[in-house]
């Protein structure tokens, strides 16, 4: 059984369905590439998937270690290059609502930067990841 199904709807838009859950989303080409920008672009999803994967893996590590990271927010920005058109950099800033010891921070940060999506992307794509904690 496939993981998902994607259908081209026309007008530079796709609709995707997650097979197991039935959840759907659309993509729309960005305004700088002939689209309407009415939804995530495919490259937006790549950048967002990286942050989602990092949050998920940090969640797994936090569960194993009795930590709580609920409410942690990721701000994601991507930079595009040309010739060929591609993502050149993904910048992610994580904002934790709670503080952690240095050892706990290292554990969470190592988990994030080693997530499966991070390790699957080209080494040509710069991943700039910053972690922000409340001031003590």
Q: What residue ranges belong to the model's regions?
A:
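Extended beta-strand/beta-hairpin segments
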Residues: 1-48, 59-136
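Alpha-helical metal-binding/catalytic segments enriched in His/Glu/Asp
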Residues: 53-54
């Amino acid at each position: 059984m496939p993981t998902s199904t994607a259908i081209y709807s026309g007008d530079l838009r796709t609709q995707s369905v997650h097979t197991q859950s039935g959840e759907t989303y659309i993509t729309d080409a960005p305004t700088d590439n002939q689209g309407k920008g009415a939804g995530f672009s495919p490259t937006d999803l790549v950048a967002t998937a990286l942050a989602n994967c990092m949050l998920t893996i940090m969640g797994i590590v936090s569960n194993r270690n009795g930590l709580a990271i609920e409410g942690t927010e990721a701000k994601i920005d991507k930079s595009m290059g040309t010739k060929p058109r591609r993502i050149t950099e993904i910048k992610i800033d994580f904002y934790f609502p709670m503080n952690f010891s240095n050892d706990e921070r290292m554990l969470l940060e190592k988990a994030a930067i080693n997530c499966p999506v991070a390790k699957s992307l080209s080494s040509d794509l710069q991943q700039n990841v910053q972690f922000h904690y409340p001031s003590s």
